[in-house]
């Protein structure tokens, strides 16, 4: 049996590799492409550390096979900054101390980008509900919520 070839656009670059059928997208991103900003926390879809955008929608990459991402547009945390300039959500996390150890931060940021899209007046409750499925073991989420609200207001 031959292994499938996957082709997708990752952070604006067309990539193509032969993969095993059971390779998770998070594993493909980290091991084949060296994009280690997408973290593996639980490997079961519980923690949100692996959130990326698939065709502009937040998805947990540990729940998607690489073959399911064939011909899709993938954006990881490495693909959101403009050169040396942080993405506004990254900047808001920095300015509002929205991280401690940083392990959950890439997934939080990727989820938050979609969450605030077109919603400058998002409420704290909407932010907290929108982050369900993204776990931070270090903080009480206060500064994360503050950072997301700041990014929403700045768009």
Where are these regions (language model features)?
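Signature of N-terminal electron-transfer/Fe-S-associated modules in redox systems
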Residues: 1-155
């Amino acid at each position: 049996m031959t292994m499938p070839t996957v082709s997708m656009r990752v952070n604006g670059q067309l990539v193509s590799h032969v993969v095993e059928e059971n390779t998770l997208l998070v594993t493909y991103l980290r091991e084949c492409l060296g994009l280690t900003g997408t973290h593996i926390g639980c490997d079961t879809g519980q923690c949100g550390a692996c959130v990326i955008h698939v065709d502009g929608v937040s998805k947990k990459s540990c729940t998607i096979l690489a073959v399911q991402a064939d011909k899709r547009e993938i954006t990881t945390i490495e693909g959101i900054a403009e050169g040396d300039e942080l993405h506004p959500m990254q900047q808001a996390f920095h300015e509002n101390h929205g991280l401690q150890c940083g392990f959950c931060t890439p997934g939080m940021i990727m989820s938050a980008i979609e969450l605030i899209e077109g919603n400058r007046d998002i409420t704290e409750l909407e932010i907290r509900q929108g982050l369900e499925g993204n776990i931070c073991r270090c903080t009480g989420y206060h500064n994360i919520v503050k950072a997301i609200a700041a990014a929403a207001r700045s768009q």
